[in-house]
From Swiss-Prot:
Spans through the membrane: 142-167, 175-195, 217-239, 255-276, 292-315, 341-356, 368-391
Glycosylated sites: 72, 100, 106, 128, 291
Gene Ontology terms, MF aspect: G protein-coupled peptide receptor activity; peptide hormone binding; secretin receptor activity
Organism placement in taxonomy: Eukaryota, Metazoa, Chordata, Craniata, Vertebrata
Compartments in which it is found: Cell membrane; Basolateral cell membrane
One GO location term (cellular component): basolateral plasma membrane
Pfam family membership, one: 7tm_2
Protein name: Secretin receptor
Presence of keyword Phosphoprotein: yes
Domain of life from the UniProt record: Eukaryota
Disulfide bridges in this chain: 45-75, 66-107, 89-123, 215-285
UniProt xrefs under InterPro entries: GPCR_2, GPCR_2-like_7TM, GPCR_2_extracell_dom_sf, GPCR_2_extracellular_dom, GPCR_2_secretin-like, GPCR_2_secretin-like_CS, GPCR_2_secretin_rcpt, Secretin_7TM
Extracellular side: 23-141, 196-216, 277-291, 357-367
Species of provenance: Homo sapiens
Protein purpose: G protein-coupled receptor activated by secretin (SCT), which is involved in different processes such as regulation of the pH of the duodenal content, food intake and water homeostasis. Ligand binding causes a conformation change that triggers signaling via guanine nucleotide-binding proteins (G proteins) and activates cAMP-dependent pathway. Upon binding to secretin, regulates the pH of the duodenum by (1) inhibiting the secretion of gastric acid from the parietal cells of the stomach and (2) stimulating the production of bicarbonate (NaHCO(3)) from the ductal cells of the pancreas.
Length: 440
């Protein structure tokens, strides 16, 4: 039977949970994960104190002036009167605040003194700080924002994916890559909803213990979907760069390689991360990343993909500028390249370049980082759907044709007006609806 939380410990845990949000994957942490760490420390402490009392020979030892004890957050070894005992900050505080402080007690003739300094001050958590309540409110607002963002992105992505799948004239390598990107954003949104539902549905102790394996699997799925999303953003950059830099290449062969890379490479890194977590940091539901070296198994490849996309973006702009300055380039090609340049500029946030700014950001910039990664990042799928589908001239033409055919079939005596003027329609008709006439 696990002990209940004392009021002082509850007061200490509240700001700890807030601080944990900056180290988790984008939502408020589970109370039972923190409790699990506390219980592990308690069990370890009681075992050490038991061995201390019995000694190496297994015989009962005389009790010193101050008997060893567990005070609900720290383990204090036995001591003789007149000595000051120092212990590290509790593990659950160190892993959440990344601060290595110390706590002290004096052993007197009357027993242990009070702990000094107070754990909340020595270990980097100020329970009297009025900003804790504001931060909690801010994080809850962020949660609402990213829930709305992922929901709207999910709806728009499903519609966009349905459109690209429904019209055969839109089936080509470029749109196949777009569809894989849509699926990665859909999985990212769904995994986020599943994570929130499983991890934060209950803080009851029995629930936490019974569903620990399930919530770890959810976190593995969540990390895979995040990495797959970044992988397909990189594939978009690689394909666009290849299209501009190489005159002739086998799109079918490249597509097979892109698919293997986009879905396969994240599986490798996530599997390595899961193995490392299981053997080296099997704490809670794996939603708190205290061991930086293990977390870099996930974070490193993501940052590398962002840097590669940034380099690709710079080179894409260089190629476009060179083509625009070439005198041999014809007028219609100049117009095409200008449209391509404008489209490429819109890809800056999609390539995740802004994440580089926060890759090694200090703790005081964490709230700004969370805003960009959660609030704005959740709408990324919506922007992708609009850019790659709803603003695509070929898609608009195919939808317009389908609408006109349906309207003529249902209302033959009432012809429908065209969505666009005749000049635009004629221009799109000349393209024959092929996927190769535009980049996005």
């Amino acid at each position: 039977m696990r002990p209940h939380l004392s009021p002082p410990l509850q007061q200490l845990l509240l700001p700890v949970l807030l601080a944990c949000a900056a180290h988790s994957t984008g939502a408020l942490p589970r109370l039972c994960d923190v409790l699990q760490v506390l219980w592990e420390e308690q069990d370890q402490c009681l075992q050490e104190l038991s061995r201390e009392q019995t000694g190496d020979l297994g015989t009962e030892q005389p009790v010193p002036g101050c008997e060893g004890m567990w005070d609900n957050i720290s383990c204090w070894p036995s001591s003789v009167p007149g000595r000051m005992v120092e212990v590290e900050c509790p593990r659950f505080l160190r892993m959440l605040t990344s601060r290595n402080g110390s706590l002290f007690r004096n052993c007197t003739q009357d027993g242990w003194s009070e702990t000094f300094p107070r754990p909340n001050l020595a270990c980097g958590v100020n329970v009297n700080d009025s900003s804790n309540e504001k931060r909690h409110s801010y994080l809850l607002k962020l949660k609402v924002m990213y829930t709305v963002g992922y929901s709207s992105s999910l709806v728009m992505l499903l519609v966009a994916l349905g459109i690209l799948c429904a019209f055969r004239r839109l089936h080509c390598t470029r749109n196949y890559i777009h569809m894989h990107l849509f699926v990665s954003f859909i999985l990212r949104a769904l995994s986020n909803f599943i994570k929130d539902a499983v991890l934060f549905s209950s803080d009851d102790v029995t629930y936490c213990d019974a569903h620990r394996a399930g919530c770890k699997l959810v976190m593995v799925l969540f990390q895979y979907c995040i990495m797959a999303n970044y992988s397909w953003l990189l594939v978009e950059g690689l394909y666009l760069h290849t299209l501009l830099a190489i005159s002739f290449f086998s799109e079918r062969k490249y597509l097979q390689g892109f698919v293997a890379f986009g879905w396969g490479s994240p599986a490798i890194f996530v599997a390595l991360w899961a193995i490392a977590r299981h053997f080296l940091e099997d704490v809670g539901c794996w939603d708190i990343n205290a061991n930086a070296s293990i977390w870099w198994i996930i974070r490193g490849p993501v940052i590398l993909s962002i840097l590669i996309n940034f380099i690709l973006f710079i080179n894409i702009l260089r190629i476009l500028m060179r083509k625009l300055r070439t005198q041999e380039t014809r007028g219609n090609e100049v117009s095409h390249y200008k449209r391509l340049a404008r489209s490429t500029l819109l890809l800056i946030p999609l390539f995740g370049i802004h994440y580089i700014v926060f890759a090694f950001s200090p703790e005081d910039a964490m709230e700004i980082q969370l805003f960009f990664e959660l609030a704005l990042g959740s709408f990324q799928g919506l922007v992708v759907a609009v850019l790659y589908c709803f603003l695509n001239g070929e898609v608009q033409l195919e939808v317009q044709k389908k609408w006109q055919q349906w309207h003529l079939r249902e209302f033959p005596l009432h012809p429908v007006a065209s969505f666009s003027n005749s000049t635009k329609a004629s221009h799109l008709e000349q393209s024959q609806g092929t996927c190769r006439t535009s980049i996005i």
